[in-house]
Regions:
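Glycan-recognition and catalytic cores of secretory/periplasmic carbohydrate-active enzymes
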Residues: 1-183
Length: 183
């Protein structure tokens, strides 16, 4: 993080644009329609819908808050993070979208990453607890070959390396925060 005024001005400009995408309840509209200049969502593809993955958007807000101390940034970040309750199942997994049973390991790792970073700044225990529940769910789904499926409750059946690497990194960070060897 820097004190370079030009970089900070650009960061604020980008953050202000992002803030326009955040609804009053903290959900994030995923993209802007260029013709109308309005943020929107679409059922065309999974990443054009509101979802657990957008919890990660709290990170740049909190990073700028740490420099600027502007309260609206931490308040908005907490609004975004508090939406974990809309997406997290009782078993700890995160639904990709609030209106489905589909779970995607990659988007779940985004939610965990956002909540873990938010915990490091806010010390809100429910963020850390949510991360632990999600990581425990991941551990319970490790298959005999050491993998975890990318999708659950979805037509596609595949496995991928990148979310496993993310989950391992998040387990290590969580252990560091907890000063434990749980994961």
């Amino acid at each position: 993080i820097t004190n370079d005024s030009q970089i900070l001005q650009n960061a604020e400009k980008l953050i202000n644009w992002m803030l326009e995408s955040i609804e009053p309840n903290g959900t994030v509209m995923p993209y802007m329609e260029l013709e109308t200049k309005k943020f929107s969502q679409s059922n065309d593809v999974w990443y054009k819908q509101k979802g657990c993955l957008h919890i990660k958007t709290c990170i740049p807000l909190l990073q700028l808050y740490k420099i600027s101390k502007k309260e609206n940034l931490i308040q908005t970040a907490e609004q975004i993070c508090d939406n974990f309750k809309l997406f997290q199942n009782n078993d700890g997994s995160f639904m990709i979208h609030g209106d489905t049973k589909i779970i995607n390991l990659h988007t779940q790792s985004y939610a965990i990453e956002g909540l873990l970073f938010a915990y490091s700044v806010t010390k809100k225990q429910d963020y850390l607890t949510s991360c632990q529940k999600a990581l425990n769910w991941c551990m319970s789904n490790i298959e005999n070959d050491g993998s975890i499926p990318l999708w659950f409750n979805f037509k596609d059946k595949s496995k991928a390396i990148y979310p496993i690497a993310q989950i391992i990194r998040l387990m290590i960070l969580t252990d560091k925060i907890l000063n434990s060897n749980q994961y």
